[in-house]
Amino acid sequence: EYCGESCYLIPCFTPGCYCVSRQCVNKN
């Protein structure tokens, strides 16, 4: 699900979240 942050030029700060299509998501 969406983690509430974007990641176009910066990494995801929320633990467990990763970048998919410029959005930070997790596996849930």
Curated annotation (Swiss-Prot):
The keyword Disulfide bond applies. This is a cyclic peptide. It holds the Pfam family Cyclotide. Probably participates in a plant defense mechanism. Keywords: Disulfide bond, Knottin, Plant defense. The presence of a 'disulfide through disulfide knot' structurally defines this protein as a knottin. It comes from the Eukaryota. Belongs to the cyclotide family. GO terms for biological process: defense response. There is a cross-link at residues 1-28 (Cyclopeptide (Glu-Asn)). Disulfide bonds join 3-17, 7-19, 12-24. This is Chassatide C12.
